[in-house]
From Swiss-Prot:
It comes from the Bacteria. Its cofactor is pyruvate. This is Aspartate 1-decarboxylase. It comes from Exiguobacterium sp. (strain ATCC BAA-1283 / AT1b). Its EC number is 4.1.1.11. The active site is at S25 (schiff-base intermediate with substrate), Y58 (proton donor). Its main location: cytoplasm.
């Protein structure tokens, strides 16, 4: 059986832009994408730590080193500049593959730079 597991997470990202009139998606600094293995057009879930909103969309590459986290289209109604968010991507694998799988988790600072890179989701950790 194939199951779905988290493979990448950008934790504590800060929204830098919200563009209502853009055609959907989220724009992410390509350096951040590379840090955790998220690819262009990949399906992601985004949660807003400020208001509890949770959406699904796809990724557009943003300028390297810019720190950009921009919610585009209708998502801009639920995310505002300065909101802290979590961006998660999932992969499908067998139960056997999942036994050795370790997701990449980048904990970001307020400038959307990688502060910590983890290879597991630690239970009961407050970051």
């Amino acid at each position: 059986m194939i199951r779905t597991f988290m493979h990448a997470k950008l934790h504590k990202a800060t929204v830098t832009e919200a563009n209502l009139h853009y055609v959907g998606s989220i724009t992410i600094d390509e350096d951040l994408m590379d840090a955790v293995g998220i690819m262009e057009n990949e399906h992601v879930h985004i949660t807003n730590n400020h208001n509890g909103a949770r959406i699904e969309t796809y990724v557009i590459k943003g300028e390297r080193g810019s720190g950009v986290i921009c919610l585009n289209g209708a998502a801009a109604r639920h995310f505002q500049v300065g909101d802290v968010v979590i961006i998660m991507a999932y992969g499908q694998m067998t139960a056997e593959e999942a036994k050795t799988h370790r997701p990449k988790v980048a904990v970001l600072n307020e400038q959307n730079e990688v502060d910590q890179l983890l290879y597991e989701e630690i239970a009961h950790t407050i970051l």
